[in-house]
């Protein structure tokens, strides 16, 4: 086997690809990163317009992985601040605390509804003790852990708004991983005894954040790579040529033309569905068929510049109700006061969509008008206060975890794993719901494997990604 890894081509300039590139560059390897967008970062980028800054939905950084935490803190230096997480759920024309606070829920939903929630939860737990049932869908899992009433009140509407399909079609494997270990009982316990996220990472009270937006992490990674390597934005990968389960070259194209480049190792964080279709010769039919069945959810972000110092005091506001077209709001100035000019603020609304649907195809003016009208109806702003706007469409923002997705992914993993110099990584690359820290760790661990391979030795079992010298550049 060829253990040389002097030239590494990284296909995708999101957090995973950039983290891999940074670690590999610091280890002295030659790196080229290709990103189809005009800017690096993927979904973790910050948009700047007229002195206002906003992320594509707001992305917090929180991790329990010491190495990833050190990697980001070392990278960002003095740019990081600590932010308190304060979130609300807008439901039935009321605001509820998230995480759940029992008294808030009791007075908000009313005692009869609260009693019904607790009774349903108790009944589900008793039913589970008598006969365990298979939890195939999100609906199965949530009803088992929260009860039918809570599912109908909150989880059903919000989940179907976010994912665009019925809860019975959303995989339980995803939701179990996403809010692992969380149940109604634990949420109530957390409300009375604050853990600050120690035991329930999805309920972390504080997180770190760059003063100028989450995109600064991607920008700093790019700067590190470009000390000796190359990051090419606006450059699309169109083909991967292979022989004997070894990638031999990649065809890339940008405004200057196309080129075929050779590398020793290839890291792909692009959507796994795109990767499979780019392989030349084409994969077997059953592999192409599996890839065609995996789908992504798209995102449209509408940001409104507002002539007011502050609108809310929240990190996020979740809106499950179907009569409101967006699913979440955040106010970047509550994350960092440098995200808007003095005396002004900015509100960001997230519209979940499928590419080609009415939301995706609506023009910017229509989307802006829709956001303003609904925010005004909710009592947040007045139309006269809006002094500017921006609309950003993010295709393939989130893998869509339909029932059966894992079996499809396993087919692709098994096939792609046969290529000796191809490494798939990241959220879209692995078709997994990675938070920021997972995306970064995926890049670090992929880089570690390549570094060990280039040194002619395999990483010990379970030690991938633990190369501190490569991570910290020392």
Language model: regions and residue ranges:
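Dinucleotide-binding Rossmann-like beta1-alpha1 core, especially the glycine-rich loop
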Residues: 50-129
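A conserved FAD-binding loop/helix module that cradles the flavin
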Residues: 428-450
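FAD-binding beta-loop-beta segment adjacent to the flavin cofactor pocket
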Residues: 337-342, 395-424, 428-430
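Beta1/beta-strand and adjacent pyrophosphate-binding region of the FAD-binding site
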Residues: 2-16
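Active-site/ligand-binding neighborhood in enzyme catalytic cores
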Residues: 105, 119, 123-245
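Glycine-rich FAD pyrophosphate-binding loop
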Residues: 11, 25-48
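Mid-domain catalytic core of redox enzymes
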Residues: 27, 235-384, 392, 464-468, ...
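A short, Lys/Arg-enriched amphipathic alpha-helix followed by its capping loop at the start of a domain
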Residues: 20-29, 228
């Amino acid at each position: 086997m060829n253990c040389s890894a002097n030239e590494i081509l990284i296909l995708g300039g999101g957090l995973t690809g950039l983290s891999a590139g940074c670690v590999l560059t610091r280890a002295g390897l030659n790196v080229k990163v290709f990103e189809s967008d005009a800017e690096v970062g993927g979904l973790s980028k910050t948009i700047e317009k007229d002195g206002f800054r906003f992320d594509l939905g707001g992305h917090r950084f929180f991790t329990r992985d010491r190495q990833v935490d050190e990697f980001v803190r070392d990278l960002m230096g003095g740019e990081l601040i600590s932010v308190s997480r304060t979130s609300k759920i807008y439901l039935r024309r009321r605001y509820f605390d998230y995480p759940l606070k029992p008294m808030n829920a009791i007075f908000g939903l009313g005692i009869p509804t609260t009693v019904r929630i607790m009774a349903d939860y108790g009944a589900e737990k008793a039913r589970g003790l008598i006969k365990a049932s298979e939890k195939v869908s999100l609906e199965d899992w949530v009803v088992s852990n929260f009860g039918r009433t809570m599912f109908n009140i909150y989880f059903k509407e919000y989940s179907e708004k976010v994912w665009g399909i019925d809860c019975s079609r959303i995989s339980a494997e995803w939701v179990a991983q996403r809010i692992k270990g969380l149940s109604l009982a634990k949420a109530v316990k957390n409300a009375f005894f604050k853990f600050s996220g120690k035991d329930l990472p999805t309920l972390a009270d504080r997180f770190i954040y760059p003063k100028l937006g989450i995109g600064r992490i991607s920008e700093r990674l790019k700067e590190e790579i470009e000390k000796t390597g190359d990051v090419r934005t606006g450059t699309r990968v169109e083909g991967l040529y292979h022989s004997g389960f070894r990638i031999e070259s990649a065809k890339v194209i940008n405004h200057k033309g196309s080129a075929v480049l050779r590398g020793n190792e290839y890291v792909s964080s692009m959507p796994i569905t795109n990767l499979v279709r780019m392989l030349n010769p084409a994969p077997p039919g059953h592999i192409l068929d599996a890839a065609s069945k995996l789908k992504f959810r798209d995102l449209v972000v509408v940001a409104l510049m507002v002539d007011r110092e502050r609108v809310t005091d929240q990190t996020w506001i979740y809106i499950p109700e179907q009569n409101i077209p967006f699913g979440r709001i955040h106010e970047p100035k509550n994350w960092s006061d440098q995200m808007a000019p003095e005396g002004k603020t900015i509100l960001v609304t997230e519209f979940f969509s499928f590419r080609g649907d009415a939301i995706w195809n609506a023009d910017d003016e229509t989307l802006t008008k829709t956001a303003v009208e609904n925010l005004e109806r909710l009592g947040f702003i007045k139309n006269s206060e809006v002094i500017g706007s921006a609309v950003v469409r993010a295709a393939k923002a989130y893998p869509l975890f339909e029932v059966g997705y894992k079996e499809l992914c396993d087919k692709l993993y098994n096939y792609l794993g046969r290529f000796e110099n191809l490494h798939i990584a990241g959220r879209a690359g692995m078709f997994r719901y990675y938070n920021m820290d997972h995306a970064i760790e995926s890049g670090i661990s992929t880089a570690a494997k390549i570094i060990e391979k280039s040194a002619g030795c395999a990483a010990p079992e379970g030690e991938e990604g633990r190369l501190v010298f490569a991570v910290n550049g020392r």
